[in-house]
Amino acid sequence: MEPEETLESESSEKSLFSSQQEYEESQEAEETGAENPLLQPTLTGDVEGLQKIFEDPEHPHHEHAVQLLLEEDIVGRNLLYAACMAGKSDVIKALAKYGVNLNEATARGYTLLHCAAAWGRLETLKALVELDVDIEALNFRGEKARDVAARYSQVECVNFLDWADARLILKKIITKSSLIITDPEKGPGKLFKEDKSTILNACRLKNEWLESHPEASISEIFEQKQQLEDIVSPILAKMSTPRHFAAS
């Protein structure tokens, strides 16, 4: 199911997920016949051609390469959205090297991740997540990319984004637990040396587990999350308990 006419009446949302052909036509119309020179290499996945434009000072479009890349159509889409619609993950990876903001959103809050999710471009989603885009970004409906994928019945994309979210949750808990040690104000009280060591070791082991298990299932990830919480929670509870000292 392609997200073409199933969106609601807001014209900008319809246009955001219009067909690749319509995207090209809109670009040509806006440029009054002068097509954006980055459009074709973006849509065809010509990474070498794009790199030449960005890296060869002698190329006629080199000086304005970033400006051309970020040039928006009437609904606020630049060529990165075209790459997402076309499923050109290699193009996204290549263009990311030139300092573009992969989290930038249209006026209605649609990010590249939302776009790739709506179109069912699984490999593009994977590339964007690998590049650390914000998977929690919300559009004007309050939808994450995962919700948009579900709306268009992009099952593989939903499953992948659920998996990416599970990894993010574990990373956040690791970070929060580490902050108890590195930033004492984040904790509820004074931390004993042995407890500090316990938390540090647990966080280190969970980070190592994440790095060494890139294909871990959602249930395995949540099992690791639970293990970490089972270690940290009793320590936090102990820190929160008032200490009573015997009178001398």
Curated annotation (Swiss-Prot):
InterPro entries: Ank_Repeat/CDKN_Inhibitor, Ankyrin_rpt, Ankyrin_rpt-contain_sf, HSP70_C_sf. The keyword Endoplasmic reticulum does not apply. The keyword Iron does not apply. Gene3D superfamilies: 1.20.1270.10, Ankyrin repeat-containing domain. PROSITE patterns: ANK_REP_REGION (PS50297), ANK_REPEAT (PS50088). May play a role during cell division. Keywords: ANK repeat, Cytoplasm, Repeat. ANK repeats lie at residues 75-104, 108-137. One of its GO terms (biological process) is cell population proliferation. It comes from the Eukaryota. Residues 1-42 are annotated as: Disordered. GO terms for cellular component: cleavage furrow; cytoplasm; Flemming body; midbody. Residues 1-10, 22-33 have a biased composition (Acidic residues). SUPFAM superfamilies: Ankyrin repeat, Heat shock protein 70kD (HSP70), C-terminal subdomain. This is Ankyrin repeat domain-containing protein 45. It is found in: Cytoplasm; Midbody, Midbody ring; Cleavage furrow.
